């Protein structure tokens, strides 16, 4: 299977997000790459489901709390930027202060 670099990146994000989701379900706190992947994948999937950029920006701030990530991780992630494919094309979604 030949994949473009962008497609490989999305698969890597998806794999890391799946691992993060499983760890959250077990009550474990997420580290930096897990938190980034989890938020990114939720935004990518929401765009795929037909939601708007504004909806994804708001939704991205509701996904994780400080209690769900390791100490100091919330401060390391002031914003998350994700390129997602929406109904009307690919757009950059920026979520400011994603971990509340």
Swiss-Prot record:
Record keywords: Cytoplasm, Hydrolase
Record's catalysed reaction(s): urea + 2 H2O + H(+) = hydrogencarbonate + 2 NH4(+)
GO cellular component, one term: cytoplasm
Keyword Cytoplasm among record annotations: yes
Signal sequence, start to end: none
Molecular function terms, GO-annotated: nickel cation binding; urease activity
Compartments, record wording: Cytoplasm
Major place of residence: cytoplasm
Tree of life domain: Bacteria
Enzyme Commission code(s) on record: 3.5.1.5
A biological process term (GO) from this entry: urea catabolic process
Listed pathway(s): Nitrogen metabolism; urea degradation; CO(2) and NH(3) from urea (urease route): step 1/1
Family according to the record: Belongs to the urease gamma subunit family.
Summary of subunit composition and partner proteins: Heterotrimer of UreA (gamma), UreB (beta) and UreC (alpha) subunits. Three heterotrimers associate to form the active enzyme.
Name recorded for this polypeptide: Urease subunit gamma
Gene: ureA
């Amino acid at each position: 299977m030949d994949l473009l670099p962008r497609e490989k990146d999305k698969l890597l994000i998806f794999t890391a997000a799946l691992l993060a989701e499983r760890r959250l379900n077990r009550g474990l706190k997420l580290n930096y790459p897990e938190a980034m992947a989890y938020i990114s994948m939720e935004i990518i999937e929401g765009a795929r489901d037909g939601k708007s950029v504004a909806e994804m920006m708001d939704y991205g701030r509701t996904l994780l709390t400080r209690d769900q990530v390791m100490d100091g991780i919330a401060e390391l992630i002031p914003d998350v930027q994700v390129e997602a494919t929406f109904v009307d094309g690919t757009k950059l979604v920026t979520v400011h202060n994603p971990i509340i």
